[in-house]
Amino acid sequence: MKKVLIVEDDPVWAKLMQYYISEAGADSRVVIAPGQALEMIDDWHPDALVLDMLLASETGVALLNELKSHEDLANLPIIVCSNVGITRDDMEPFGVRAVLDKSTMTPAQVRQALTEVLQ
């Protein structure tokens, strides 16, 4: 079973993403901060990452920079879900494979993005 790590500090959104990931046939875990994400990546070895860009402790950009600096993590598939108005072109230098707008995304869009990055 594929594994997806969710980095999200809003418990409602985290549960919703877990549901979508479960519906896509994958297992998931949730952390609320970039530092926790790095620990979980080392311990759990997820196949993909779903990242909120606006976290209480810091922005998702800090985690993206950290992942990019680790050769063994540079190719980890990442889906950004946020309300910030970010485009895939903005995130391409970080290796982000999909960008979903929380205010308009549908379950079908989440499933499609997950299917594409988990292939």
Residue ranges and their predicted role:
Residues 79-81:
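Hydrophobic/aromatic residues positioned on beta-strands within the core alpha/beta folds
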Residues 8:
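Conserved acidic carboxylate
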Residues 52:
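Active-site residues of response regulator receiver
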Residues 30-48, 109:
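Acidic, metal-coordinating helix/loop segments flanking the phosphotransfer/catalytic sites
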Residues 11-29:
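Two-component/phosphorelay signaling modules centered on CheY-like receiver
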